[in-house]
Amino acid sequence: MEKAGSTDFHVKKFDPVMVAPSLPSPKATVQLSVVDSLTICRGIFNTLLVFNAPDNISADPVKIIREALSKVLVYYFPLAGRLRSKEIGELEVECTGDGALFVEAMVEDTISVLRDLDDLNPSFQQLVFWHPLDTAIEDLHLVIVQVTRFTCGGIAVGVTLPHSVCDGRGAAQFVTALAEMARGEVKPSLEPIWNRELLNPEDPLHLQLNQFDSICPPPMLEELGQASFVINVDTIEYMKQCVMEECNEFCSSFEVVAALVWIARTKALQIPHTENVKLLFAMDLRKLFNPPLPNGYYGNAIGTAYAMDNVQDLLNGSLLRAIMIIKKAKADLKDNYSRSRVVTNPYSLDVNKKSDNILALSDWRRLGFYEADFGWGGPLNVSSLQRLENGLPMFSTFLYLLPAKNKSDGIKLLLSCMPPTTLKSFKIVMEAMIEKYVSKV
């Protein structure tokens, strides 16, 4: 378990400015898909990318990225507009051409203060721009970019996008395009495609999409912590081989790690054995539609898979059993979406809506953020920043799967909002489960 130990710092922000597309953009109202309009997609992406200083010491990263933002909005012109609510609760985008919000900032310290983005450090909150919680949806900027300079020349780029206009892959596509324009490219290498009607159902009356109610936050009775845990690639591969020998079918790294985490977290939290626990995880559905969604589509094209089990059965069962439950959840979602229309079964949470009983896994390993190169190499680190209230995340059930510092090293798990004693128990359970397989060597 890696101990978080980041340093507090202060960010000086200059007045925000609006950055309009560098060329006139179409004035129109474009529709969002039914998936974009889901309540679960009303959140905000806050992505932070950390970079070393540019090799060219005369380069001004603030100016470069501000100009790149103006250029990329020509191709992503809907993002220069505003969201609008329709009568039936769905959303649309009014392409106003107003532009994106751009913030320049600076820190009187070196980039080393960001060496550990796994920490719940309130200082990190200053590295992105936050709308007030009561901001009307019509007043949200669809793109906000904050560039923060450090005394060593390193920079942090914070990008904020509403989930309603893109999913994780779509957000990474936009950031990559922004980086390409910063490098001097004439246009993005991947043409952005809006076409949200591709995900609308043939029969709106038949539309029943997976949604889940808000999850009750944990009672703040004790200090909560956040930590990371790396599972090396050799361990993952060996466990995969062991499991595949048992079931005679392919198992992915995600399935093995997700099952491992689900069991270990459930045991560490000491959830009553009579209760149910649920594992939620998003799946990219772009290739499952008929025809598949085109490359460059940056709207929400994800579905949420749900794996549920009784606590006693999960803890008494094998790793393979948990993997098979996860496989079934994936298969069920694929079956529902492998048609030309968006249709799934209605869903309700049968887990008492307690945050401990629900774990949402978010896999960031292949979204594309780590490939963003603004002209001075790839990012040192990438992080999804959650809004903190009173020093704690507003959403406490997410666990992120990230590449380790060196991608070939394995998978990094980022756990948050768990008491330090529980984090310690989680580590012990994880190591014991891994040792059970590795000791067979």
Curated annotation (Swiss-Prot):
GO MF term set: 3'-N-debenzoyl-2'-deoxytaxol N-benzoyltransferase activity
Catalytic activity: 3'-N-debenzoyltaxol + benzoyl-CoA = paclitaxel + CoA + H(+)
Gene field: TAX10
Family under the similarity heading: Belongs to the plant acyltransferase family.
Biological classification of the source: Eukaryota, Viridiplantae, Streptophyta, Embryophyta, Tracheophyta
Organism encoding this protein: Taxus canadensis
pH dependence, entry free text: Optimum pH is 8.0.
Known pathway: Alkaloid biosynthesis; taxol biosynthesis
A biological process from GO: paclitaxel biosynthetic process
Annotated S-S bridges: none
Active site feature: 163, 373
Coiled-coil regions listed: none
Signal peptide positions on this chain: none
InterPro entries, alphabetized: CAT-like_dom_sf, Plant_acyltransferase
Enzyme Commission number(s) of this protein: 2.3.1.321
Alphabetic keyword roster: Acyltransferase, Taxol biosynthesis, Transferase
Function per UniProt: Catalyzes the stereoselective coupling of the surrogate substrate N-debenzoyl-(3'RS)-2'-deoxytaxol with benzoyl-CoA to form predominantly one 3'-epimer of 2'-deoxytaxol. This enzymatic reaction constitutes the final acylation in the taxol biosynthetic pathway.
Name listed for the protein in its UniProt record: 3'-N-debenzoyl-2'-deoxytaxol N-benzoyltransferase
